[in-house]
Amino acid sequence: MFDIGVNLTSPQFARDHDAVVARAFAAGLSGMLLTGTSLHESEQALALAQRHARCWSTAGVHPHDSSRWTRETEQRIRTLAQAPEVVAIGECGLDFNRNFSTPQAQEAAFSAQLALAAECGMPVFLHCRDAHERFMALLTPWLDKLPGAVLHCFTGTRDELQDCLRHGLYIGITGWVCDERRGLALRDMLPLIPANRLMVETDAPYLLPRDMTPKPGSRRNEPAYLAHIMARIAHWRGEDAQWLSGETDNNVRTLFGVAM
């Protein structure tokens, strides 16, 4: 049971990284991917991955930070990507929901990171919100040059899901699906995702599953809660959770080349 999306560089984890990681492995995780969302956080994620066994990281710039993308950023991400613990370029993509960076800056940074991933022969860890058409237009020409791609924290429509699957993307599902207010449509789509295209993630410390009982004392999500998300996903898909965990671990090995 591998968590492909842990924001361990978040200030919410600053005081207890080691305890969070220990709880995750005590809860049965086989490994976790620490997300880099800026140059600084990519450097931090790598340092944490080097500190903890069975942890790997990504290196990239989130669309929110795209306005900070420069040639120097690109070179430093390229250098980070040479570390054995870095197994994907990202988190990169487009987010037209809040536009913390302009769409033009987002597209430029996304395209540059796709080119960098192709140059390095690495998969991409992707973000898309309210931008599917433009996201796919930029991504599709690169897909045959990349070893693979996962769209992290999918929350799109049925048509968008089917489009992503047609293009061979892996789909990351978070505790969003456990939200009785926002997650019902995604819950209904779960059976559409082939088991060999599914990955699971907490996106911790965000997206604490709302249906956990008893509720955690803190609203902070943790990778230790991945077992709950996996069990709920398996239930709604009509599958055995242990079997599905094995399938998603195989997908992680295939895309990221990690040894768990």
Curated annotation (Swiss-Prot):
Might you report a single GO cellular component term?
A: cytoplasm
Top EC category: hydrolase
Q: Which cofactor does it need?
A: Mg(2+)
Q: What is its EC number?
A: 3.1.11.-, 3.1.13.-
Where in this chain does the entry annotate a coiled-coil region?
none
Under CDD domains, the record lists: TatD_DNAse
Annotated keywords: Cytoplasm, Exonuclease, Hydrolase, Magnesium, Metal-binding, Nuclease
Q: What does this protein do?
A: 3'-5' exonuclease that prefers single-stranded DNA and RNA. May play a role in the H(2)O(2)-induced DNA damage repair.
Q: Which PANTHER family match?
A: DEOXYRIBONUCLEASE TATDN1 (PTHR10060:SF15), TATD FAMILY DEOXYRIBONUCLEASE (PTHR10060)
Q: Which family does it belong to?
A: Belongs to the metallo-dependent hydrolases superfamily. TatD-type hydrolase family. TatD subfamily.
- Name of the protein this chain belongs to: 3'-5' ssDNA/RNA exonuclease TatD
Q: What lineage is on file?
A: Bacteria, Pseudomonadati, Pseudomonadota, Gammaproteobacteria, Enterobacterales
